[in-house]
Structure formats: structure tokens, C-alpha cells
Amino acid sequence: MVKAAVTGAAGRMGARIISVIGDTEGIELVGAIEHSEHYALGQDAGEVAGVGKLGIEISSDVDAVVKKADVLIDFTFPDVTIENLAVVSKHKKSAVIGSTGFSGAEMEEVKKIASNISCIIAPNMSIGVNLMLKLVAEAARTLGDDFDIEMVETHHKLKKDAPSGTAMKLAEVAADAVGRNLSEVGVFERFGMTGARGKKEIGVQTLRGGDVVGDHTVYFYGTGERLEITHRATSRDTFATGAVKGALWISGKAPGLYDMQDVLGLK
């Protein structure tokens, strides 16, 4: 039985992860974490998540919670995630990271810590999105420079980072497939007299509004035709289910940085 702890336990994602853990064989919740000033501290994690009393209080003591778990599932923010990973490393546990918005320096810190532990990090835990990554790479390789690559992502109005981590990963995968460096060819804003589109450009545009869970579309524009690859998430359970699948998979794995492509056998 894999023993899991969940950060952001009173949040939207944390609550869904706790619910999915309760419905999944082979894994159990042993700890729930929130920040030190959160209103839900001391409350039962199951009751806060809407799944009934579990006998597990929400705590801000990351060290104590991680110590009794096998794997930490973390959907927070980059700086918080790095602090939590340091605790995971201290206790030689495993981690599943769904946080997004990491800077280059922060990702280097994550990689450094992950050299000591087994850790999954993925901007999107959805099975469908991870299959989409593979399809986008294959389409980009096949269509090559004859097709223009653009993408649009939409999320709810409360999302803090833009573009989404998923959109950035899709853009990176497409760029790699056609031998380009996204940092050189990525276009994240167009306004005014921009001139003709550059042949090597990869456009990534962001929309925010309402309660959209997450929509991503990658467009391949050719002459006289276009290909669209779209994924729409209608429930956070798709991410929670992937995270729990990852937690089951990562337990006992050798130290290193993995992603959902590894979990799903898509590499």
C-alpha cells in the first residue's frame, strides 16, 4: 500500500486528489498539508474535501507529514514546491509535482533535488494531454517547415501563470520536433504592425475567463489545409487521476526526474 500526502489539501486540486485516492486501490492518504495561515488547519481533510471524515487533520508541518508518507503529491507554486522537495529529499521519499510556472533557475533547482529522489514533474497529469504531446511531436516532424505552428490555450480567470505550463510543453515538443529553439522562435504576443509572420515562428496565445478547466489546441497551417489537435478538460478529476496514477508508479523507482510520458509508457 502506497502512503500518500497531499499539499494544498483544502484547494480545488487537493480536494479532488484526496477524493481520487479514496477511490483507488493500492494507495491511502496519510497526510494533508496547507500553509501556516490557512483557515482549514486542524480540520479533517476528508470533510474539507467533501468525501466524509477520514481522521486526518490538515497540517502545516511539512516535515512531520512527509516523514510518514511514501510519496508527496504537490500542486502548489514553484517556490513552495522547491521547499517541499527539499523536505522530500531529506527523508528520501518520492514526489509527484503538478505545479507550473517554474523559471529556468527554479527548474535547475528541481533537477538538482531530483537527483537524490524519484520525482515525477509534469505540467499536466491528464492522460489525454500526454498522448496529445506525442501526437503533436509526430505531426510536427511529419509536416516540417511547410506548415506554420500556432497554439491557443484557455483557462479559468483565477489562473496565475501564462501561458499555461501545458501550452509551454506543447510548444517545446513541437519546436524540438522541427529542430528549433523555442526561446528563439516563440511568439507570445502580437499587437500592432507586426509585419508578416516569420517562417520559423511558433505562436502561443493565452485566453482567460470564467471557470474553464483547461483547453489546448495546436494548429498546423499549410497551403489549402490545416490540422488541429485539441484537448479539452471538463473536470479536475482528469488531473487528479493522473497524479494518483503517477504516485502509484513512482513509489520504489530509482532516483531521477520522470514525467507522465514515463508513467504511461509513451516514450
Locations of regions flagged by a protein language model:
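Short glycine-/small-residue-rich Rossmann-like dinucleotide-binding loops
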Residues: 70, 76-77, 100, 206-208
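Rossmann-fold NAD(P)-binding glycine/threonine-rich loop
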Residues: 82-91, 98-121, 130-139
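Residue-level detector of anion-binding/catalytic polar loops
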Residues: 71, 94, 118, 148, ...
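C-terminal substrate-binding/catalytic lobe of Rossmann-fold NAD(P)-dependent oxidoreductases
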Residues: 7, 12-63, 144-267
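Extreme N-terminal starter segment of soluble prokaryotic enzymes
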Residues: 1-4
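Rossmann-like NAD(P)-binding element
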Residues: 63-83, 89, 93-94
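Short, ordered loop/turn segments at secondary-structure junctions
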Residues: 35, 100-102, 124-126, 154-156
